[in-house]
From Swiss-Prot:
Annotated Pfam families: FUR
GO process annotations (BP): negative regulation of DNA-templated transcription; regulation of secondary metabolite biosynthetic process
Recorded family membership: Belongs to the Fur family.
Entry's Gene Ontology molecular function annotations: DNA-binding transcription factor activity; transcription cis-regulatory region binding; zinc ion binding
UniProt name for this protein: Peroxide-responsive repressor PerR
Gene name of the encoded protein: perR
Organism in which the protein naturally occurs: Staphylococcus aureus (strain N315)
Coiled coil (UniProt feature): none
Gene Ontology cellular-component terms listed: cytoplasm
Keywords: Cytoplasm, DNA-binding, Manganese, Metal-binding, Repressor, Transcription, Transcription regulation, Zinc
Function: Manganese-dependent repressor that controls a regulon of oxidative stress resistance and iron-storage proteins. May act as a hydrogen peroxide and organic hydroperoxide sensor.
Record bears the keyword Zinc-finger: no
Annotated positions binding Zn(2+): 102, 105, 142, 145
Amino acid sequence: MSVEIESIEHELEESIASLRQAGIRITPQRQAILRYLISSHTHPTADEIYQALSPDFPNISVATIYNNLRVFKDIGIVKELTYGDSSSRFDFNTHNHYHIICEQCGKIVDFQYPQLNEIERLAQHMTDFDVTHHRMEIYGVCKECQDK
């Protein structure tokens, strides 16, 4: 088993444990949605998740996807990302990280920059706020769109 598959399975097991601890029933559809989110690096919309899973789950609906995403978000295992357009995207990675977004195709890529965490501490120190989190987005044009 590859390291990536082992990592996905580990994340899935931890997420299922969190759901069970919250009293949430584990269904095959719920597992499939979680597995898709964990293995996806594209920050999918609910519609994209539906398109990917509907061949294997013909009875699944977009409403089922949204309902499960809401449950995952409420428990804290998924983040909902809202941007200028009307569609929400979902990110399994709930740790502090940042996004760079293509202005042409909407592609979202994660990146890490540990020094930005210092900004949170500095803001808290300078304002006496109890800082709970922060969000940073950088916009540009991805390599694929540049090459078109």
